[in-house]
Amino acid sequence: MGYVKVVKTSPYFSRYQVKYRRRRQGKTDYRARLRLVRQDKNKYNTHKYRLVVRFSNKNVTCQIVYSTIQGDVVMAAAYSKELPNYGLKVGLTNYSAAYCVGLLVARRILTKLNLADTYKGQEEPDGEDYNVEPVEDGPKPFYCLLDTGLKRTSTGSKVFAAMKGALDGGLDIPHNEKRFVGYADKKLDTEVLQKYIYGGHVAEYQETMQEEEPEKYQAHFSSYVENEIEPDGIEDMYKEVHAKIRENPCPPKKERTKPADAKRWSPQAHL
């Protein structure tokens, strides 16, 4: 038998340092988080805001967050499950829906800070890269950083669709057009990006499947069939959703009903 070096010795275990809980669970990249959270030493009591974008199987979440010693504070949040209130009932996790959620959280935070009329953003997205310009006599635009978490930042990722929606909504986010869908050969194809914002890629696939595999189309696009959404009407549908989001980004909350009086049951004494 060959020589086997003993690695995990008593000194190894005595010096072993347990990693943070969320690192052990594989939920947080603390190296990236430190660079997103740490503020300059000469900016006293100034928050560093982040646009947090997360994806699940059925939902897209966008939040405006800043960190404190006690924990993170969420200033505004938007979810794709809210989009049916604005007229979008299908495809709540695709590229176009991620754009809508980013637009919604941007308009929501600017409305909360009374900046919605000052910074309206790109009201009619044309696929061009948009950067908000500060007004001369007024407050600066709301500045935040994109927090992608553990999501891989590949070109064309839905993370950047949410960021594009927030940019067009009027937020100031440092970015590069290289990560938007349609970027190839060192230039951005604005027509491709505009097509994805308005769901054109879904409409194309819908038309192809209707012609080639009608039976599979009924199953794959069952929610579209149920809501009577045809490929020709998808672009107009998304335009209406964008307009409704800008019109009322903060719908009134439902009033909570008064809870019923708690009944107390005391055991009966048995003789």
From Swiss-Prot:
Which terms are listed as keywords in the entry?
Answer: Cytoplasm, Nucleus, Ribonucleoprotein, Ribosomal protein, RNA-binding, rRNA-binding
Q: Which PANTHER family match?
A: LARGE RIBOSOMAL SUBUNIT PROTEIN UL18, RIBOSOMAL PROTEIN L5-RELATED
Q: Which Gene3D superfamilies match?
A: 3.30.420.100
KW Nucleus (keyword) present: yes
Family, per entry = Belongs to the universal ribosomal protein uL18 family.
Q: Which gene encodes it?
A: RPL5
Which organism is this entry from? Answer: Dunaliella salina (Green alga)
Q: How does it assemble?
A: Component of the large ribosomal subunit (LSU).
**Record's signal peptide:** none
Which segments show compositional bias classed as Basic and acidic residues?
Answer: 245-264
Localization per Swiss-Prot or TrEMBL: Cytoplasm; Nucleus
Its protein name is Large ribosomal subunit protein uL18
Q: What does this protein do?
A: Component of the ribosome, a large ribonucleoprotein complex responsible for the synthesis of proteins in the cell. The small ribosomal subunit (SSU) binds messenger RNAs (mRNAs) and translates the encoded message by selecting cognate aminoacyl-transfer RNA (tRNA) molecules. The large subunit (LSU) contains the ribosomal catalytic site termed the peptidyl transferase center (PTC), which catalyzes the formation of peptide bonds, thereby polymerizing the amino acids delivered by tRNAs into a polypeptide chain.
GO molecular function: any one? 5S rRNA binding
A single GO cellular-component term on record: cytosolic large ribosomal subunit
SUPFAM superfamilies reported in the protein's UniProt record:
Translational machinery components (SSF53137)
